[in-house]
Amino acid sequence: MSDNKNIRDIGTFFNGYAAEFSSIYLEDERPRSLFNKVMDRLFRKDIETRLVDSLNHMRKDSIKTVLDIGCGPGHLVVKLLELNKDVTALDIAPNMLEITQMRVDSMKLESNFKTILADYSEHEFDEKFDAISVMGFFDYVEDPVSVLKKLLNDASKEIYISIPGDKGFLAWQRKVRYKRRNCPLYLYSKESLEQYPY
């Protein structure tokens, strides 16, 4: 695991949060409280939107190999495997990868799939990927420029990125909630991203 304390803290947080996080996508895996159901409906629609948008782009026949960085509990991974893509799922939380592996195993698909337990910024690949999905990942990236440069090196065709905004109620409550749980969180505005030299 990473020598970076922030990365270790993020991995620890998501390792403990894996089952609950997975239930945001699929409630039948773990029932959600009424409060969480309301929060999901009001403030977490972007999770589903990102998933659908990413899939719509990656359906192309030209996209054969996909790296899902910060794969979480594997919801995008499963959808990509259903599209017969070769998928590499990378995460820093072992429990997230375990949930992903169990979900993939239950599908009984003949596909090329593997998991990698690593900090993306420190992991070197032997191959380039046709597409890289980076959804819900930059929330935990302190240095976005170095990650963006690495993405450009690791992708041969396309990169799908979502970058969290720093405004509104959802951003505010996430800042409070994650600080209480000792999980570093990085939110960005257009202006803050423009300050980085590309």
Name the predicted role of every residue range.
Residues 2-59:
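Conserved class I S-adenosyl-L-methionine
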Residues 70-72:
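Class I SAM-dependent methyltransferase "Motif I" SAM/SAH-binding loop
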Residues 141-150:
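A short, conserved alpha-helix within the catalytic core of class I
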Residues 164-184:
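Short, glycine-/aromatic-enriched active-site segment of Class I SAM-dependent methyltransferases
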Residues 184-198:
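Short alpha-helix
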